UniProtKB/Swiss-Prot annotation:
Coiled coil start-end: 926-1079
Organism encoding this protein: Lachancea kluyveri (strain ATCC 58438 / CBS 3082 / BCRC 21498 / NBRC 1685 / JCM 7257 / NCYC 543 / NRRL Y-12651)
Full protein name: Myosin-2
Start-end of Low complexity biased regions: 1082-1093
Residues reported to bind ATP: 164-171
Length: 1554
């Protein structure tokens, strides 16, 4: 061992267990080593020893590990595996909010006493699913996943043993393990998503947790939810590795808790849940009140648990009971039994001198008996009396008061324990029925069992618990030993037998024929057996060799005995051992209970009898041959527990075992507080230190050859390893290099062994190698610095000499130049002075002359302006007078003219109204309508002319107003001009003020007069405006009347047109009927024609895609019109007949559309240079629109429904089945076509609802049918669009998921900053390169962009798709990044930043600047990796920059940072500061509640369902649809339909034109 100055070590401490220190002095005098140790509290300790071997002298301090190893994830990787190193490693990880640590095969789980739900989220389950242990950080799920994989691959049953003392978190750990198994199946199924619902069986398995916790857990001083029983849950799997059921075994329920609770503790949760959750009516029926009223509940004084709502827990329990098949009625019966137990506890027994008495009328007794359905008299009798059965008679005797209390409590405990067993039996019946049992292929067992316990007073319960832990510890030690030796054999290394502490003597002490349990059973079966007698037998039998090594009696007293357990010696108090072991209820009470009228109670007792019978059968089978016994003895609680423990160990030994040791870090249950001494005692008790001791006896540290060479090759000269970088390096070369390294640096060959795949090291060797490596790096860095500094300072010296010489020469030249320059400057100064003086004199003269000239010009200007102003004022006055005098006559004339026009229009209106009445009576005549139409047209023309005249007059008045307004503006300008002139006169001609004042007053008078005139003009203008408004109102009235007249005229036109069409149709029909009669054709061939004709008027406008137009009807005196009308109607009828036949045959049409159009089409190509028209892209939708609209036009509503149902289903199937390269193009293609179809349906709905012209020829029922059909179709297409969008986007996400992590996280595109992905050695064998690059991601986004652009998908939809995918990339890459170990470095940060920046640039180049916001988490994570982390200021900077990251995420990234060899490791103080800041900020954000990890470290991955972005934008506009079918499509029926529709539209258009 090395104790050089500066060596860090550990020294024992009473308060902290161990304290850190450093060797500050080491001397060696007289063969004695004198060490001076400075502790962390500055205390100095001096140690003197003859040896430096810590195993030979306990006074020597224990060596401390290098800082880089102190917070290791696996304790076995510590170089110095000693007690303080293990404690410090767990403490360091706990301080960094890491509650899990490996210790070989054991997972150590330290209770955080905080809410850390994010550690067990579905994202975390998904992260660990399929991962090997060691790939990710230590976690509960890593153990569960390992068990699941081994069961699946090796076909071997598994067991997970969860142990620890009360409050360590065993129950929570077991619960989350069960949740993992219930969730992991879905994560491993193809195309499954982690949000899928669990199966009914899995829900039932998880429902057992709240049930067992309610009936078997209670609040203790150490734990608010302490399990008071042991539980082994087998999760059952079938051949397909699917969960099909479960089985529960329970061990040693703490019966005494029902009747007694220590201070600050509670009874079982279910009682408090009942009182909080039952309704007042139910409480009244059960005669229940408050907690304080019941003896069985008020002894502890703690009725409430902080942060727990018993009413909510009651609802959870009730729901769980219902889920496992216990009906509401049965639940109520259970609650009646529980209420009865509370009333039994309140039964008051009267105390006499020697006996006890109890009346059957005692109120609490009466209520209890009523609820249980038993006889109160007999029940009361057997509380105060006992019966002894002899061979000849039964003897009944009285009990004293204390015995009566025991009898009362015994029957209560008996009923509750029986109820608990009945619950477990019912759960097993539901979860493992015969059908399930027949399909069981394998199972994973989860053992949640009490840890080693030792209190001031230890009783029967602690004895059984510690006995179970002895058995488990023995199995654990053997398992660890076995694994160690298997590893050595597998690697074929030399090894010797590893000694370890075997606790078999302690187990023999308990189990042997003359052991503690046997003597206890023997004494319990004696009627007069007592604790004192049993104690004496123990002393006599066991306090002698060989058992006295593990058994002893205390120095004082005769009521205790001491057992030396593997963890420590425990003193047991014998009081109550006999009574608890008997665990009996009197035969009298048993008979009373079995006579109950409560069927549930009888069922509970029957279950108990069945269990007793099974136990008796097992004892009979296991009984050794010998003389037959006369009596069947009732099994004691100790024997039952022993038998069940033997069965449990048999089960565990037959499975592959995994261990989880739960640690309680402090007694006060305060979040993230670590008590060294308490944890240390638990590490000793749970066997972790023993495991490490076994490992230390062999080769605890092991490295692969490649890892060893990668780290320690620098310890030998480079000529040995430089050639290893070549591509032809083999594994044998690597092994030879390892031998060379070890041979050069390790003298003792016993310190290591070379295996087949690994190198094994003794304890302390890694620290030695690390020291050599750090020394080599230090020496190398010093040498490099020396050489670099030498070169640097020599260059600096030569540069200084050269600069001095240059300075001398340059200084002399500078001084010479300075003298010459001074002479030149002197001459120049004289010349400049002379020039300046002459220039100054010249400028003064010029300035004076200029001022005189300017004054003269100003005077002349003033006089000229005055004369000009007078002239303008005179002209303006004349002009205003002229316009005002002309205004009144003109106004009078216009008024007279308007009045005349109004009178004329009113008269004409009266005549028109009269004429209208006449026209209405003559409307039946078609010829008369024509004449009327012509006259009305003339009337419209006249009215239009009249309106034009009115408008013209209005324009004239407006022009007049504008002229007056202009005059007013001119007057205002005059005023402004005068004011400006006044200012100029005041400044320039101050000396002429008096003369100018006279003139100014005259001008002022004129201005006042002008203002008066302007005011009068304003009043006149206002009057004109008022009159103009009146004229406008009158004109509007006339226009409204004119519009009414035009509307009336339009109605006549419409009626005329309809009548003409009707007449033509009837004539054509008559002609056809006559022709049919003449040719002998039957009437059956034209039965569909009237329907088609009737539908025509309703949907013809939809068929051609144009809006309905009103046509003017103009009378024509052409004799050939009627013949043309007949031929047109005949053509339309023929087209409609053929269309009807084609569309009515939906089977042929559907087959052709589905197979030929939908499934057999070719997607138009996309790309940068490809531009497709809408008809080339949307032809499938438009063909369907044409077919659909004509089906509606011809009344084929039923056929259209079946047709569309087939189309919708086919399109959705096509998108669902998209794979590979077709996914992007086909998805975008169908997205835009479905949008086109949806837009058409919306257009059709709006047309039918808002335009009456579409409804002509439809009765009310037909109209409702069409409205309903279109509304349903709208919903169907909306759903189809939503489904297609979601299916397509999820497929894009799935394709992106394969590429994103490899491209964004793994790929290294930035040259010069490549981080090593693996060892530089063996490049061909071990190199791993990312499968996808960033170019693949950009190509992916480019394909989406061009497909959506080419296929005319709306821009808003494109933006939403890209933003969703970018957020998805950000989330999955960040979640992958944050879970990576030994990966996060500053070089990786640069590469990440470069990769994400390329995505940002793509977004900006495609007009998506907001895309940067979607990638914030990855950007900030990359920045975090690049920033310094050396001090607290750096951490504050990181916190400011990484504003989008949660505190827990920042802490996780920093703690995962992989420090390079040339970097300084992040100090432990910094890591602790970050963790403390996370706790502080989370505490503040949760309003004082302790929720350190209230936020998940994972980002939420949005995997749908997504909102359809089409729902947020307007539908597409519809014009005339161009019929287009590509030539390569084989659609004969569809082509004919389109041709006929085109012909129909052509004929209809020609008819409209005529």
């Amino acid at each position: 061992m090395s104790y050089e100055v500066g060596t860090r070590c550990w020294y024992p401490d009473k308060q902290q267990g161990w304290i850190g220190g450093e060797i500050t002095k080491h001397t060696n005098l007289s063969n004695k080593h004198q060490l001076e140790l400075t502790l962390e509290d500055n205390q100095i300790v001096e140690i003197e020893s003859e040896t430096l071997d810590e195993t030979k002298d306990d006074r020597l301090p224990l060596l401390r590990n290098p800082p880089i190893l102190e917070a290791t994830e696996d304790l076995t990787s510590l170089s110095y595996l000693n007690e303080p190193a293990v404690l410090h490693a767990i403490k360091a990880r706990y301080a960094q909010l890491n509650i899990y640590t490996y210790s070989g095969i054991v997972l150590i789980a330290t209770n955080p006493f905080d809410r850390v739900e994010q550690l067990y989220s579905q994202d975390m389950i998904q992260a660990y699913a399929g991962k090997r242990r060691g790939e990710l950080e230590p976690h509960l799920f890593a153990i569960a996943e390992e068990a699941y994989r081994l069961m699946k691959n090796d076909k071997q049953n598994q067991t997970i043993v969860v142990s620890g003392e009360s409050g360590a978190g065993k129950t929570v750990s077991a619960k989350y393990i069960m949740r993992y198994f219930a969730s992991v199946e879905q994560n491993n199924e193809e195309n499954a998503h982690h949000n899928l619902e669990m199966s009914e069986t899995e829900k039932k398995i998880l429902a057992t947790n709240p049930i067992m916790e309610a009936f078997g857990n209670a609040k203790t001083t150490r734990n608010d939810n302490s399990s008071r029983f042991g539980k082994y849950l087998e999760i059952l799997f079938d051949k397909e590795i699917s969960i099909i059921g479960a089985r529960i075994r329970t061990y040693l329920l703490e019966r005494s808790r029902l009747v007694f609770q220590p201070k600050s503790e509670r009874n079982y949760h279910i009682f408090y849940q009942l009182l909080a959750g039952l309704t007042n009516e139910e409480k009244s029926q059960l005669k229940l009140t408050g907690v304080e009223d019941y003896h069985y509940m008020n002894q502890g004084g703690e009725a409430q648990i902080k942060g727990i709502d018993d009413a909510e827990e009651y609802q959870t329990t009730v729901e769980a009971l219902s889920l496992v098949g216990i009906s509401k009625d049965t639940q109520y019966q259970l609650f009646k039994i529980l209420a009865a137990l509370l009333h039994i506890g309140n039964v008051e027994i009267k105390k006499t001198r020697n006996d006890a008495s109890l009346s059957s009328d005692e109120p609490n007794l009466a209520i209890a008996c009523e609820l249980l359905g038993i006889d109160s008299f007999n029940f009361a009798k057997w509380i105060t009396k006992k019966q002894i059965n002899t061979r000849s008679e039964k003897i009944v005797s009285n009990l004293n008061y204390n015995q009566a209390l025991v009898a009362r409590d015994s029957v209560a405990k008996f009923i509750y324990s029986a109820l608990f067993e009945w619950l477990v039996d019912n759960i097993n019946t539901v979860l493992c029925n015969p059908e399930v049992a027949s399909e069981i292929n394998s199972f994973i067992g989860v053992l949640d069992i009490y840890g080693f316990e030792h209190f001031e007073k230890n009783s029967f319960e602690q004895f059984c618990i510690n006995y179970a832990n002895e058995k488990l510890q023995q199995e654990f030690n053997q398992h660890v030993f076995k694994l160690e030796q298997e590893e050595y054999v597998k690697e074929e290394i030399e090894w010797s037998f590893i000694e370890f502490n075997d606790n078999q003597p302690c187990i023999d002490l308990i189990e042997n024929k003359l052991g503690i349990l046997s003597l206890l059973d023997e004494e319990s079966r004696l009627p007069a057996g007592s604790d004192e007698t049993w104690t004496q037998k123990l002393y006599q039998t066991l306090d002698k060799p060989p058992t006295n090594t593990v058994f002893s009696k205390p120095r004082f007293g005769q009521t205790k005995f001491v057992v030396s357990h593997y963890a420590l010696d425990v003193s047991y108090d014998v009081e109550g051992f006999i009574e608890k072991n008997r665990d009996t209820v009197s035969d009298g009470h048993l008979e009373v209970l079995k006579a109950s009228t409560n069927e549930t109670l009888l069922s509970i007792l029957e279950t108990l009898d069945k269990h007793a019978a099974k136990l008796a059968e097992k004892e009979q089978v296991n009984k050794k041959p010998g003389p037959a016994r006369m009596v069947n003895r009732k099994p004691t609680l100790g024997s039952i527990f022993k038998q069940s423990l033997i069965e449990l160990m048999g089960t565990i030994n037959s499975t592959n075992v995994h261990y989880i040791r739960c640690i309680k870090p402090n007694e006060v249950k305060e979040a993230w507080v670590f008590d060294n001494l308490m944890v240390l005692s638990q590490l000793r008790a749970c066997g972790v230190l023993e495991t490490i001791r076994i490992s230390c006896a062999g080769f605890p540290s092991r490295w692969t050859y490649n890892e060893f060479v990668l780290r320690y090759h620098i310890l030998i000269p480079s000529e040995h390893w430089s050639k290893m970088f070549s591509s032809d390096t083999t594994e044998e070369d690597i092994r030879d290099l390892c031998r060379t390294i070890l041979g050069a640096i390790v003298e003792d060959k016993q310190k290591y062994q070379l295996g087949n795949t690994k190198i094994f090291f003794k304890a302390g060797m890694l620290a030695y190698l690390e020291k050599l490596r750090s020394d080599r790096l230090h020496n190398s860095s010093v040498l490099i610095q020396k050489k670099v500094k030498a070169v640097y300072y020599r260059k600096k010296y030569l540069a200084i000499i050269s600069s001095i010489r240059n300075f001398h020469s340059r200084s002399e030249g500078f001084l010479t130049r300075q003298r010459v320059d001074l002479e030149f400057k002197t001459q120049a100064a004289i010349l400049i002075q002379s020039m300046v003086r002459s220039t100054s004199t010249r400028n003064k003269t010029i300035s004076l002359l200029s001022a005189i000239t300017r004054l003269q010009s100003l005077v002349r200007k003033q006089l000229a302006q005055k004369e000009l102003l007078q002239r303008r004022q005179r002209d303006a006055a004349v002009s205003i007078q002229k316009k005002i005098r002309a205004f009144e006559p003109r106004q009078s004339f216009n008024t007279t003219r308007r009045s005349t026009v109004v009178v004329q229009s009113l008269v004409r209106k009266k005549f028109a109204q009269k004429k209208l009445k006449d026209l209405k009576t003559e409307a039946k005549s078609v010829n008369h309508l024509k004449e009327v139409s012509y006259k009305l047209e003339n009337k419209v023309i006249q009215l239009t002319e009249s309106l034009a005249e009115k408008v013209k007059e209005n324009k004239g008045m407006t022009a007049r107003i504008q002229e007056l307004q202009q005059s007013l503006n001119e007057s205002a300008n005059i005023k402004e001009l005068l004011n400006s002139q006044k200012d100029e006169h005041s400044k320039v001609l101050q000396q002429q003020k008096d003369a100018h004042d006279v003139q100014f007053n005259e001008v002022q008078e004129k201005l006042v007069n002008a203002k008066k005139e302007v005011e009068e003009a304003k009043e006149e203008i206002e009057q004109l405006i008022a009159k103009q408004d009146e004229l406008k109102a009158e004109v509007r009235t006339k226009i409204e009347e004119l519009n009414k007249a035009k509307k009336t005229f339009t109605e006549f036109q419409t009626q005329n047109s309809d009548l003409k069409n009707e007449v033509k149709s009837l004539k054509d029909e008559i002609a056809r009927l006559q022709a049919a009669v003449r040719s002998g054709v039957t009437s059956s061939t034209i039965t569909s024609t009237p329907t088609a004709s009737r539908r025509f008027s309703a949907h013809s406008s939809v068929a051609d895609g144009t809006s309905p137009r009103q046509l003017n009807v103009i009378s024509m005196n052409n004799g050939g019109i009627e013949d043309d009308a007949r031929s047109t109607a005949s053509a339309l009828s023929q087209i409609n007949d053929e269309l009807y036949k084609l569309l009515e045959d939906t089977k042929s049409l559907n087959t052709e559309i589905v197979e030929g159009l939908l499934k057999g089409f070719k997607i138009p190509e996309t790309g940068v240079a490809v531009e497709l028209t809408r008809k080339e892209v949307l032809y499938p939708a438009r063909i369907l629109i044409i077919v659909l609209s004509d089906m509606w036009r011809l009344g084929l509503t039923k056929q259209s429904e079946s047709f569309l149902a087939e189309v919708l289903s086919t399109i959705q199937k096509l998108v669902t089945n998209l794979k590979g390269d077709d996914m992007i193009l086909h998805g975008a293609f169908w997205l835009t076509n479905v949008r086109e179809l949806y837009s058409f349906v919306v257009f059709a709905q709006e047309s039918i609802l808002n335009d009456d012209s579409y409804n002509n020829g439809l009765n009310e029922d037909e109209y409702k049918e069409y409205v309903t059909l279109v509304t349903e179709l709208k919903d169907d297409f909306e759903s189809l669009s939503y489904n297609i969008y979601n299916i397509w986007l999820k497929k894009l996400q799935k394709d992106l998921e394969r590429k994103a992590i490899s491209a964004v996280v793994m790929s290294q595109s930035l040259p010069g900053f490549i981080a090593p992905e693996s060892s530089p050695f063996l490049p061909k064998l071990f190199s791993q390169s990312s499968h996808y690059k960033m170019d693949d991601i950009l190509t992916f986004f480019n394909n989406i962009y061009w497909s959506m652009k080419t296929y005319h998908v709306e821009t808003e939809v494109f933006r939403e798709v890209i933003m969703t995918l970018l957020k998805y990339v950000d989330a999955i890459c960040f979640n992958d990044l944050i879970m990576r170990r030994n990966f996060l470095s500053w070089k990786r940060g640069l590469q990440l930043n470069y990769n994400v920046t390329r995505l940002e640039e793509w977004c900006k180049s495609h007009q998506l600047p907001e895309g940067t916001e979607c990638l914030q988490h990855m950007l900030q994570a990359s920045k975090l990796l690049q920033l310094k982390k050396a001090n607290l200021e750096d951490i504050n900077i990181i916190w400011e920059i990484c504003s989008s990251l949660k505190p827990a995420q920042i802490q996780k990234l920093i703690s995962q940072y992989a420090v390079a060899d040339y970097e300084v490791p992040i100090p432990q103080e910094i890591l602790n500061f970050v963790a403390d800041r996370v706790k502080k900020e989370s505490s503040l954000s949760s309003d004082g509640k302790s929720q350190t990890h209230s936020s998940d470290i994972f980002l939420s991955v949005d995997s749908g369902p997504f909102e359809d972005p089409f729902g947020q934008i307007e539908t597409r506009e519809f014009g005339k649809i161009e019929a287009y079918i590509p030539a390569w499509l084989n659609l004969p029926i569809t082509r004919r339909v389109v041709e006929l529709v085109t012909q129909h539209v052509t004929v209809q258009e020609s008819q409209r034109t005529e």
